[in-house]
């Protein structure tokens, strides 16, 4: 997986075992993080699981696969899955596949200092770092959300306090830290009270397919993107839908930037399998409970000639990652007209890819995000039709 995002003033790209920090203007690399092939060499340890009494594992000497991966007894390839900053930009969190772990770094201008490394039982799908020194790390896996509640002094075990029956794609924490907002493959957005997470505050219901992304707009409003080809704005405190905007294709990634004046936003959406790869929308709040899309810009990004998987948005450019001939590729487009960006330093792409030491790259198959639907009614009607015809033939015979 290749991850890319823009955090003023840095463009951050993670792939394989490296994270590169670039100046988006001249695309020069000024900092990098490289993980070792074996994370146990930088301190990855595991805690032996304590099975329930009478459980078969309590007497078994066989090591779980996840434990073997972390301890290194089974050789697995380490690759970066996600990279994210804390709000104050002082902490950087990486999650990995292969040897599943979360690494927490102190971000400094010249380099990054590793503070802690912890194993994960499952691969992380959408990590978030919250307020520094307080409940900072979230790790979203298929059916749980885990919090590690200290930065420098980790708790012996993470705390799992929310349950999901399908893959969680995004998470938000309200500004007052009273609500946790999550979305998943099962069409719904859930608003959970915190710290009483057993109590569901509200649901935002209406999507017909997976909800791929969330973003906070105001203290009470969020925006969501979905595979059902819609953008929707919600008052999440009561679960009320305020805006439904039809998209030309399913949305698999969403980025939101606040513009001037206040209550005006730029929303960028990556489409699934569409002639125009990215849509850029201007979203404005007209009244307290009213929102509207006032402009639309579609970016072709040469869709169809390569397999686009992710993108980052700056003031005037869109940085797009994808695969071409099974190799990682980066391209830059002008967000105002959708054309290839001009004025880029010669050889910047080769420089970035050489530093990433890119091997064969295959993006995630996003078709598995969609629900499989079975048409049992048509089969039933066909069988009924044949049965009626057979009965008629028997009567005539």
From Swiss-Prot:
Main location: nucleus
InterPro entries (alphabetical): Trm82 (IPR028884), WD40/YVTN_repeat-like_dom_sf (IPR015943), WD40_repeat_dom_sf (IPR036322), WD40_rpt (IPR001680)
SMART domains referenced in this protein's UniProt entry, alphabetically: WD40 (SM00320)
One GO cellular component, as annotated: female germ cell nucleus
Ranges for the WD repeats: 75-115, 163-202, 206-244, 303-343
GO biological process, one term: spermatogenesis
Pathway this chain belongs to: tRNA modification; N(7)-methylguanine-tRNA biosynthesis
A Pfam family: WD40
Keyword tRNA processing appears in the UniProt entry: yes
Free-text tissue specificity from the UniProt record: In testis, it is present at high level in hub cells, a niche for germline stem cells of testis. Ubiquitously expressed in all testicular cells throughout spermatogenesis. Ubiquitously expressed in all germline and somatic cells of the ovary.
PROSITE patterns in alphabetical order: WD_REPEATS_2, WD_REPEATS_REGION
Assembly information from the UniProt record: Forms a heterodimer with the catalytic subunit Mettl1. Interacts with mei-P26 and weakly interacts with bgcn; required for the function or formation of the mei-P26-bgcn-bam-sxl complex. Interacts with nanos; may be involved in mei-P26-dependent derepression of the BMP signaling pathway. Interacts with Myc; the interaction may be mediated by mei-P26 and may be involved in the regulation of ribosome biogenesis.
Other notes: Wuho means 'no progeny' in Chinese.
Name under which the protein is recorded: tRNA (guanine-N(7)-)-methyltransferase non-catalytic subunit wuho
Organism: Drosophila persimilis (Fruit fly)
Gene name tied to this protein: wuho
């Amino acid at each position: 997986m290749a991850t890319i995002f823009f955090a003023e003033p840095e463009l951050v790209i993670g792939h394989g075992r490296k994270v590169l920090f670039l100046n988006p203007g001249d695309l020069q690399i000024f900092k990098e993080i490289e993980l070792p092939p074996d994370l146990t060499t930088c301190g990855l340890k595991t805690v032996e699981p304590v099975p329930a009494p009478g459980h078969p594992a309590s007497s078994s000497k066989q090591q779980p696969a996840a434990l073997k991966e972390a301890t290194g007894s089974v050789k697995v390839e380490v690759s970066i899955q996600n990279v994210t900053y804390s709000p104050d930009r002082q902490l950087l969190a990486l999650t990995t596949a292969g040897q599943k772990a979360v690494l927490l770094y102190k971000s400094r201008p010249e380099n990054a200092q590793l503070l802690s490394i912890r194993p994960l039982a499952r691969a992380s799908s959408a990590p978030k770092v919250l307020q520094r020194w307080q409940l900072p790390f979230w790790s979203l896996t298929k059916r749980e959300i885990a919090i590690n509640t200290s930065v420098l002094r980790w708790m012996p075990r993470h705390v799992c306090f929310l349950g999901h029956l399908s893959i969680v794609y995004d998470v938000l924490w309200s500004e007052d830290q009273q609500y946790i907002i999550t979305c998943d493959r099962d069409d719904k957005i859930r608003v959970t009270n915190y710290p009483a997470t057993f109590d569901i505050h509200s649901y935002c219901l209406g999507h017909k397919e997976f909800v791929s992304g969330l973003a906070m707009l105001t203290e009470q409003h969020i925006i969501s993107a979905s595979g059902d080809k819609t953008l929707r704005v919600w008052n999440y405190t009561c679960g009320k839908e305020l805006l439904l905007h039809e998209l030309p294709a399913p949305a698999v990634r969403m980025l939101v930037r606040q513009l001037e004046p206040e209550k005006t936003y730029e929303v960028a959406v990556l489409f699934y399998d569409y002639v125009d790869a990215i849509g850029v929308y201007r979203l404005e709040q007209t009244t307290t409970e009213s929102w509207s899309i006032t402009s639309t810009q579609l970016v072709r990004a040469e869709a169809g000639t390569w397999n686009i998987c992710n993108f980052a948005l700056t003031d005037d450019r869109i940085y797009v990652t994808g695969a071409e001939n099974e190799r990682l590729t980066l391209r830059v487009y002008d967000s105002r007209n959708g054309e290839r960006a001009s004025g880029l330093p010669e050889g910047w792409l080769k420089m970035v890819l050489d530093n990433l030491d890119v091997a064969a790259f295959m993006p995630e198959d996003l078709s598995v995000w969609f629900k499989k639907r079975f048409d049992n009614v048509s089969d039933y009607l066909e069988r009924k039709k044949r049965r009626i015809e057979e009965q008629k033939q028997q009567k005539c015979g």
